[in-house]
UniProtKB/Swiss-Prot annotation:
CDD domains: HFD_H2B. Induction: By gibberellins GA1, GA3, GA4 and GA9. The modification N6-acetyllysine is found at residues 7, 28-29. Core component of nucleosome. Nucleosomes wrap and compact DNA into chromatin, limiting DNA accessibility to the cellular machineries which require DNA as a template. Histones thereby play a central role in transcription regulation, DNA repair, DNA replication and chromosomal stability. DNA accessibility is regulated via a complex set of post-translational modifications of histones, also called histone code, and nucleosome remodeling. Residues 1-24 have a biased composition (Basic and acidic residues). It comes from the Eukaryota. This is Histone H2B.2. Residues 1-48 are annotated as: Disordered. Gene3D superfamilies: Histone, subunit A. The gene is H2B-2. SUPFAM superfamilies: Histone-fold (SSF47113). One of its GO terms (molecular function) is DNA binding. Keywords: Acetylation, Chromosome, DNA-binding, Isopeptide bond, Nucleosome core, Nucleus, Ubl conjugation.
Length: 140
């Protein structure tokens, strides 16, 4: 283990020297740096992807009503609605797992959470669709 400790300070010293060399140059902008910053601007354009349900909402809308569109404001509302329902189901299934002293959330906890969170007929349809999806997933 002692040789590893000796190698690390040896690696840090040249890096520190390089940093010391780079700091005075940081004030100056060389033509090479300005050219590379143009490439950096292109990289900055690609923002961090935000996960939304917008694509899936649109696909379901087209399955149900092919001739109807949706505004971006309405899409945002639907997206936040789905996020809210997802969060409620996750909290409820987590609570159920904790009550039953189970370390994992299984499909049973999810199904019970759906029955508790969603009202009446909606819960029945959600459970049947969920069961169908789980069966399809396990069979393939």
């Amino acid at each position: 283990m002692a040789p590893k400790a000796e190698k690390k300070p040896a690696e840090k010293k040249p890096a520190e020297e390089k940093k010391a060399e780079k700091t005075p140059k940081a004030g100056k902008k060389l033509p090479k740096e300005s050219g590379s910053s143009g490439a950096d601007k292109k990289k900055k354009k690609s923002k961090k992807s935000i996960e939304t349900y917008k694509i899936y909402i649109f696909k379901v809308l087209k399955q149900v009503h092919p001739d109807i569109g949706i505004s971006s404001k309405s899409m945002g509302i639907m997206n936040s609605f789905i996020n809210d329902i997802f969060e409620k189901l996750a909290q409820e299934s987590s609570r159920l797992a904790r009550i039953n002293k189970k370390p994992t959330i299984t499909s049973r906890e999810i199904q019970t959470a759906v029955r508790l969170v969603l009202p009446g007929e909606l819960a029945k349809h959600a459970v049947s669709e969920g069961t169908k999806a789980v069966t399809k997933f396990t069979s393939s």
